[in-house]
Amino acid sequence: MARLASMPCWPLAPPESHRLSPPPPLLETGLVVAGHGRHCVVETPDGRRVICHPRGKKSQAVVGDRVQWQPSQDEGTIEKVDTRRNLFFRQDDVRTKSFAANLDQVLILIAAEPEFSEQQLSRALIAAEAEHITPLIVLNKSDLPAPFSLAWERLAPYRDMGYILMPASLKAATDEQLQPIKNQLNGKTTLVLGPSGSGKSTLINRLVHGAQAQTREISQ
């Protein structure tokens, strides 16, 4: 009779295809609220603000992007940019500069003095229309009667085309006088765009409580 030899039995390792891979890292969601070169500031659903860096060029995010990011100590890494509704950008012969995403409207702020460029205004309007973003034109410095009257007259063709135009005196206006602009912005995600000297900082500081302190904090 044949004898069966007893051999020690060792568990076989599973093939490579059956081995369990480590679970993917847990990602948090957030909104990009500021951009500074190669990093940005992401606001979480509970109001925290975290400095995040992109994972390669494909994860490059702009203000207004909804992102998924991975925490790492006191900073984070952006792993994915969610699908955008739109992207406001400027393109020339050299490069494309992205400003913001997922916008409801663009407020184009110009001033009676210094004289605004109709070419720049038209380019901004075309960029907004191309992405189906509503443009709003605000002409600042209505407290300067002569230059304001001339500037308002130059804007007549834009009024005739149906664009919304609003006069303003951002430094001198009372809160009540600024209410029409506030009503236009209420509940909407808006990009404020304009040349140097048009009053962008004044507008934001007048309309957004604590904006000056927040800007100073992010800059530091």
Question: What annotation goes with each model-predicted range?
Answer:
Residues M1-E118:
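N-terminal accessory targeting/assembly segments
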Residues V33-R49, R55-S72, L178-Q220:
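Conserved G1/Walker A P-loop phosphate-binding module
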Residues G64, A128, N140:
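Residue-level signal for inorganic ion chemistry
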Residues E113-P114, D143, S219-Q220:
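Flexible beta-alpha connector loops of hexameric P-loop NTPases
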